[in-house]
Amino acid sequence: MAKTSMIHRDIKRAKLAKKFAGKRDALKKILSSQDASYEEKIEASTKLQKLPRDSSPSRYRNRCELSGRPRGVYRKFGLGRNMLRKATMNGDVPGLRKASW
């Protein structure tokens, strides 16, 4: 089980990323625009740098909903590989079963 502080930190990052997504996209659009002047691009760049660091979506880490494990998480289920296996064996995941051939 992951430390609860790490889980809460990730939740905070997800909220910040969602909150600043529109602003961040608008500034990035200005930076990648061919029509924007050099001064506009510099201004957009400084505004982007002044946004909270945790508002960047690349700082958010997918975690298992049950254990908080940061690696080996299946996006489709939101569970880590160990918890997904346990849930599958208990029959909690509909349509999923152990392979045998």
From Swiss-Prot:
Keywords: Ribonucleoprotein, Ribosomal protein, RNA-binding, rRNA-binding. InterPro entries: Ribosomal_uS14, Ribosomal_uS14_bac/plastid. GO terms for molecular function: rRNA binding; structural constituent of ribosome. GO terms for biological process: translation. Signal peptide: none annotated. Residues 32-65 are annotated as: Disordered. Gene3D superfamilies: 1.10.287.1480. One of its GO terms (cellular component) is cytoplasm. Part of the 30S ribosomal subunit. Contacts proteins S3 and S10. Belongs to the universal ribosomal protein uS14 family. Binds 16S rRNA, required for the assembly of 30S particles and may also be responsible for determining the conformation of the 16S rRNA at the A site. This is Small ribosomal subunit protein uS14. The lineage of its organism: Bacteria, Pseudomonadati, Pseudomonadota, Gammaproteobacteria, Lysobacterales. The gene is rpsN.
